[in-house]
């Protein structure tokens, strides 16, 4: 179920490379990667999961509200991270020239399906 949802998000996002459903502990629940890509999507997301914990803690300390989404741009990629629950998030990597807006939309649209599947 998770793989189908992740594949749909990546396939429908122009320039989508891969997506990972992951816990804040850095353990992937499921993932989908486009073939022949030169980036280790899971490794990128594992490393950013530590940063997410710090951002979440800072937002709580400053009473900024619940974190919903983080976007990171590099000269090659865009990483979009959507928070699902207090334990899980979904992350997608898009080529720099990909359709960032559609990727965000699809991740938001499919969030409830992922949350429901997590039980």
What do these predicted regions represent?
Residues 1-18, 22-119:
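Non-catalytic interaction/Regulatory regions outside core domains
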